[in-house]
């Protein structure tokens, strides 16, 4: 009897111990959750994705940007710059959507008036574009905010110094943090390892990333992007005797996104054969311009335009740029010597990013071309998995918003006082960019 009694008592003790262990585990879990929650900062930082096509502006911790503005600048054609005489109700310079209106002459290259092509100084026009967006469109006082901006995957000290002048000296932000754009779209997916395929307005990059750190030795790039495709569209529409103004660039981008399709398996001769019955039957693509004009998008422009990314020689046989698939495979190949398991992680986490990747059929084409990819001394081996998020056109901004909402990010800001003490020459040394 005593043995039975002791056995029951022992079981009760085991239950009590188990309950206390469970309670302790739950308490530890709750503490961990609270730690994670406190990791997010209640202070809002301004987040700006400086895109070639569109500038996205919003606040850290939010899901979407407050403003997505075409990176356009225009001058009033009726305004006499020399004598500064113009209609009292008209502006001399306008930006964003307003720059697409017919009375203005749009400068297509607004973004490149800043760091990239003009390393010595930030242009007056680009500064005014940002002032208009921040102060007039969003009603913000820049001196009240720290700002987070993205920089090119290729770190350039001239650009970093130019951003210091632009955001701290000229715009008066109280702090500046710069994040390498290569990692941002990956963070937006919740991953830390993978290959980013960034298809931007003027460049295409492929960058392998391991545990959040870009492997720059394996970065590949091509001077081909969305702008080139848009220009092909423009040429095709002009062939159809439709007049296009410089300010219609925003509309042309919309035409590209809504009518351009990427064949999963491309055959150049097949798509150019005017007598091909399958092609003739293919649905005609129409698009309504803002002035109500209906335009027919030529098949050559609609289908061959996107091929520029996969084979730049289709439109210009003198181009020496590699196509997108070779860029991706080449980046993975450069990391193969590190670790075979790492290679598998990269192949199974290929993340598409950028507005140009939004074209119909784009993810399927990338997967189809990579599947079974081999060259003379490289075999992809594993089946590629393509991550094509529905909001990948704003993936960089989302990544910055997520990172900027963490309280630990605060230490990465270069404060205005520190900048003034150190000077612009040392900003590249002290800026913590990842």
Label each residue range with its predicted role.
Residues 150-160, 264, 347-369, 392:
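Glycine-rich phosphate-binding loops at beta-strand->alpha-helix junctions
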Residues 40-41, 47-54, 189-191, 196-205, ...:
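A short acidic Gly-Thr/Ser loop motif
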Residues 210, 214-318:
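Phosphate-binding glycine-rich/basic clefts of nucleotide- and phosphate-handling proteins
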Residues 174, 178-181, 345, 367-398:
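Conserved phosphate-binding/catalytic loops in two-lobed NTP-binding clefts
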Residues 245-257, 264-274, 280, 379, ...:
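Acidic, glycine/GT-rich loop-and beta-edge segments that sit at the periphery of enzyme/chaperone cores
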Residues 23-40, 169-197, 239, 399:
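Conserved phosphate-binding catalytic cores of ATP/NTP-utilizing and phosphoryl-transfer enzymes
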Residues 126-137, 300, 305-345, 365:
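Phosphate/ATP-binding catalytic cores across multiple sugar-kinase/actin-like superfamilies
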Residues 39-166, 175, 205, 216-218, ...:
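Conserved phosphate-binding loops in N-terminal lobes of ATP-dependent enzymes
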